[in-house]
Design a protein with these regions (language model features):
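Conserved N-terminal catalytic/coupling substructures associated with nucleotide/phosphate chemistry
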Residues: 1-95
Length: 95
């Protein structure tokens, strides 16, 4: 069902290097990052949902300059009975 592409990144779990992907999507034409889905497209879900959302939100706000919080939204989708975090990154504003 899910397959990585230039606009779709799959992550088994939250890892700090996800910020590189957020920046890359904002600097190009945007994309989505699904956290809780492995590289083969298998839905695993997120175990520490609230903790991971808070870490992710804080990392995007505090670590990326200029601020891109207006271009990145964090959502939770229920897929195959599992909670998955979706980071929807829009194309950033040109400088």
């Amino acid at each position: 069902m899910f397959k990585e592409s230039i606009h779709l990144e799959l992550k088994k779990e939250y890892v700090k290097d996800i910020l590189k992907t957020v920046i890359a999507f904002a600097n190009t034409s945007g994309g989505k990052i699904y956290i809780g889905i492995d590289d083969d497209g298998k839905v695993l879900g997120v175990q520490r949902l609230d903790t991971d959302i808070l870490k992710l939100s804080n990392s995007i706000r505090d670590s990326i300059k200029p601020d891109i919080t207006l271009f990145a939204s964090i959502l939770v989708e229920k897929i195959d009975g599992n909670d998955v975090i979706v980071v929807d990154v829009q194309k950033g504003a040109s400088s």
